[in-house]
Amino acid sequence: MVLNWRGVKSRLYSGKRRIDGRNKGLIAIRARGGALKRKYRYIEHYKQKWMDKWLFVMRIEYDPNRSAHIALCSILKEGIYFYVISVAKLEVGSLIITSNLKQGILQVGYTTKIKNIPEGILINNIELMENSGSKLSRAAGTSSLIIKQYNKKYSLVKLSSKECRLISNECYATIGTVSNIEKKIKKSKKASESRKKGIRPIVRGLAMNPVDHPHGGRTKGGMHWKSFSGKLAYNISSRKKTKMSSRYIIIGHRKQRLMDKKKKNG
């Protein structure tokens, strides 16, 4: 994909103050800091504002704040500009639309309600609740699969994490896969690439002192792996058991991955 960048629209970005993994001065996430300065681009996740209006893709740009590319769109004959997350195979000069038509034309980049999308279609930028803005499948190269219409209210969707979840038929989603699919294949060739992104070297817990890490000052074994804050790590679920949205999860991502492994092994 060729990126056509000619400067950022002044009303669509602002300065961004970096936190560098700190919370009130205390380290919340290790090995963060020292990244290049960035300008935050405002992304339009609520496309229902422009219902039944054709959007013209002016250019596709690189965004340092996210893994996916973004597309600068304008409403024809109105002079309104905004950014949206670009979809794979979306080209400069193409037209996209947000519509509720049940028998509308389904093309890459079109946004509509889940109930209007047939089974077996890949979607992205999915809403979790009605009119809440896109929340799921927004990273580079990700997409979700519509398995079937569960009932009149919900559809069964398989997310990129292999989790099978019920999502309301009234929620909006975009057809296609998020752009920059090559992100998973690309590897950093030198340390400076990671430092420019704000990723610093990570020191092993075993190499630290006991005051710095639970693994420090001792040999391996004798306890379960822990994080630097003392919480259990590796294969431990950190999700709240009493979370309200858990009732919409039909098959969790851990269970689904085990089922896929058994199918491969036969």
UniProtKB/Swiss-Prot annotation:
Gene3D superfamilies: 2.30.30.30, Nucleic acid-binding proteins, Ribosomal protein L2, domain 3
Keywords: Mitochondrion, Ribonucleoprotein, Ribosomal protein
GO molecular function: RNA binding; structural constituent of ribosome; transferase activity
Protein's GO biological process: mitochondrial translation
NCBIfam families per UniProt: rplB_bact
Family: Belongs to the universal ribosomal protein uL2 family.
The protein's name in its UniProt record: Large ribosomal subunit protein uL2m
Source lineage: Eukaryota, Amoebozoa, Evosea, Eumycetozoa, Dictyostelia
